[in-house]
């Protein structure tokens, strides 16, 4: 289980690093408003990844709740972005997907042989 917790921590750290780097790039290239929209989505993605990790920890328990709260988080983020005039929908959506970068990083690290893994 320690290996799982280490993986979970790594994924959260990589997601946070990607969030900071992309936030700075978006702020530099576009505007603070667009960057704030991205940041809101990225924070939602971090929360989603954390909730997903907690759900994986509970695999095998008798409860059968299929991620309704995780879906609700995504829906609330998108509705908030659509309704609030200061937020932009696309940066919020792309920010939410930032956690996928950490998953791709982990997959590539596991698939591509390195000197450590050989």
UniProtKB/Swiss-Prot annotation:
GO terms for biological process: proton transmembrane transport. Its main location: membrane. The chain crosses the membrane at residues 11-31, 73-93, 94-114. Keywords: Cell membrane, CF(0), Hydrogen ion transport, Ion transport, Membrane, Transmembrane, Transmembrane helix, Transport. It is a multi-pass membrane protein. One of its GO terms (cellular component) is proton-transporting ATP synthase complex. It is found in: Cell membrane. A possible function for this protein is to guide the assembly of the membrane sector of the ATPase enzyme complex. Belongs to the bacterial AtpI family. This is ATP synthase protein I. It comes from Synechococcus sp. (strain ATCC 27144 / PCC 6301 / SAUG 1402/1). The lineage of its organism: Bacteria, Bacillati, Cyanobacteriota, Cyanophyceae, Synechococcales.
